[in-house]
Amino acid sequence: MSTVISLPKVNGEYRKNFKLSHLTWFKVGGISQVFYKPKDEHDLSYFLANLQSNIKITVLGAGSNLLIRDNGIDGVTIKLGRSFNEINFVKNNHYNIISVGAGTLNYDVAKFCLQHNLGGLEFLVGIPGTIGGGIAMNAGAYGQEFKDVVYSVEALDRSGNKHIFLSKDLNFEYRQCIVNGFLIFTKTNLICYNDSKPSISQKLQKIQTVRKLTQPINQKTAGSAFRNTNNYKAWQLIDKVGLRGHSIGGAQVSNLHCNFLINNGNATASDIENLGELIRKKVFDHTGITLEWEIKIVGKKSL
């Protein structure tokens, strides 16, 4: 049974029993007991400071690397709104730095950099999602990760207190950053450098072309399903056990890139999770290697 939630009075927006499937790239998942979109950072800080401490909080980015279970999410689900989407220049004596709200799409940052002749962040065009989500999982592609470009990060803790972390404080590792306690990233400073528009444009086009040729970007998917291992790419292990194209219900292993799971139109979240767990079992049984989910799975498990 879900805990009764007493909600603080805020300037943002609450929705109860809010359907979440349309907020994820898989287009599956149940409802959130409470959905909250804060008006701004002050509103979010007040909310955190005054919410019952026993209430579970889940933070959504763009839903591009997320699987929400069919039974939905207890507690409060938070999605950062437009006030967390700003991009500004920051004066620094040593680096070219831009300040980016955590709710900003990675694609929009890459586009901003092109417009302002800033290089070094082109890889973001190949990573669906938001800046905050990218920091949380140290997302990466095409030879770069967030740890390579993050100068500092601002975050709120569970009590609404603000903290500033330098990149070294975030303990970035492959597909994760390790920090103590609950944090919601609100803003980051990213390092870039001066470059010409043609040079930046060429890099962006190359990344986008590779994505179109190698990934099922026009289907309902959530990006790489599993983390690569020390010695193998995840797709190599999935191919090795013969699961390319395999289906459970409406969920399928992509024929184009078998580390991508796709919703063929009528999949449930359970179909997708069960397919992923079948992959993990088959790979372990045949190779002794345990694949770790890269997709974040949230929500209540079915009984």
Curated annotation (Swiss-Prot):
Cofactor: FAD
Domain of life: Bacteria
Gene3D superfamilies: 3.30.465.10, UDP-N-acetylenolpyruvoylglucosamine reductase, C-terminal domain, Uridine Diphospho-n-acetylenolpyruvylglucosamine Reductase, domain 2
Pathway(s) the chain acts in: Cell wall biogenesis; peptidoglycan biosynthesis
Compartments where found: Cytoplasm
Domain (FAD-binding PCMH-type) ranges: 27-217
E.C. number: 1.3.1.98
Keywords of the record: Cell cycle, Cell division, Cell shape, Cell wall biogenesis/degradation, Cytoplasm, FAD, Flavoprotein, NADP, Oxidoreductase, Peptidoglycan synthesis
Main location: cytoplasm
Record GO cellular component, one term: cytosol
An annotated GO BP: regulation of cell shape
Listed Pfam families: FAD_binding_4, MurB_C
A GO MF term: FAD binding
EC class (word): oxidoreductase
Reactions accelerated catalytically: UDP-N-acetyl-alpha-D-muramate + NADP(+) = UDP-N-acetyl-3-O-(1-carboxyvinyl)-alpha-D-glucosamine + NADPH + H(+)
Active site, renumbered: R175, S224, E294
Functional summary from the UniProt entry: Cell wall formation.
UniProt name for this protein: UDP-N-acetylenolpyruvoylglucosamine reductase
Source species of the chain: Orientia tsutsugamushi (strain Ikeda)
